[in-house]
Amino acid sequence: GWGFDAAGFDAAVDVDPAAGLRLRLTLDAAGQFDITQAALPESRSEWRLARAGVPLLSTDPWLTVKSTNRAAYDSARTALPEGIDEVVFVNERGELCDGSITTLFFDRGQGMRTPPLSSGLLPGVLRAELGCPEEVLLAQDLPHVRLWVGNALRGLIGAVWVG
């Protein structure tokens, strides 16, 4: 692991937990950290989802760790079409993965599920908190499932697939 000055971090962070801010800690291999904070944007009660234009490779190890190596996600987020709140990535096998800033959840009528880590996605905090069973979701399944997206900052948000 990397060394980290926890006391220095505690001294550098002066945030009211009730403020509803996004706090981001970036740590490098030398143990140096950078802290940024920003207000969370207002969120709708239902997000409109579309497919990301670039497929992911499920074996890419960078998909399984929270890092700054996220060019595909950032590009897709920057290029969101009008009326779309989130894009969902598909891997080389046609399996749905993550959104650009969210985890995908779905229900076929048997309880909430989430795509398996083997599809190539981040084991996010919300995903761990909800403890949903994993199940492969293909694009052709989308008209037949109830959808949600979410993350640790925004919680679980109802979603509709618009393509």
Where are these regions (language model features)?
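Helix-start/capping segments and mature chain N-termini
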Residues: 1-22, 26-163
